[in-house]
A protein has these predicted regions:
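Histone-fold recognition with a strong bias for associated Lys/Arg-rich disordered tails
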Residues: 1-192
Length: 192
């Protein structure tokens, strides 16, 4: 199973965030910080739950401290972050997805207990259960919306296939179409 481009961007963003904080590793807290700033669905779900990116970053600095900003690139993922990525793969498999998307990272984060990211979420007042429920609800809504749009698209294609655009044909139409009142009036006059 491969990572979606958005997921790869989030992992790279987490590495940049770790480096800016002076940490020589990428942990689950860095992944959470990247997800809170994600402009798409995951960031939206977190913001709806009241997770503020700036406040979360400030709490991460208080809890884990700032390292040395001029360190070389982060040395890799912590075991916690590795488990989070494996959990995201399991979530993608459960949902029969071909790619690991940021939403799957969020679901894995909700299931992961005792992680640094989980601690930051708890401080924000978000439990794993709330996060999981909100994410699943959003994914269900998104799936239903996409299915509805697809059905409407099929209907429109059928309508276009089996109908004619009368406005486009207006120049070739007879001048009597749509003029029932006038025709009835003329017939009434002629019949007198």
């Amino acid at each position: 199973m491969r990572y979606h481009t958005q997921t790869v961007e989030q992992i790279q963003s987490a590495a940049r965030k770790a480096r800016s904080l002076g940490h020589s590793y990428v942990g689950s807290a860095h992944l959470l910080l990247a997800l809170t700033r994600e402009p798409g669905n995951v960031g939206l779900v977190l913001r709806q739950l009241g997770v503020d990116p700036e406040l979360t970053e400030a709490m991460a600095l208080l809890l884990y401290g700032a390292g040395t900003p001029d360190l070389p690139l982060p040395q890799g993922l912590t075991e916690e972050a590795r488990q989070l990525l494996l959990g995201a793969a399991r979530e993608a498999k459960r949902q029969k997805s071909r790619e690991i998307r940021p939403e799957h990272l969020l679901l894995a984060l909700a299931r992961q207990e005792g992680s640094a990211a989980g601690e930051l979420l708890q401080i924000n007042g978000v439990t794993g259960d709330i996060l999981f429920t909100q994410t699943v609800d959003y994914l269900r809504w998104e799936r239903q919306t996409l299915a509805k749009e697809k059905r409407e698209e099929v209907r429109l294609r059928l309508l276009e296939q089996f109908s004619e655009d009368l406005v486009a044909r207006a120049s070739t139409m007879e001048p009597v179409i749509g003029r029932e009142k006038e025709i009835d009036m003329v017939i009434g006059i002629l019949c007198r």
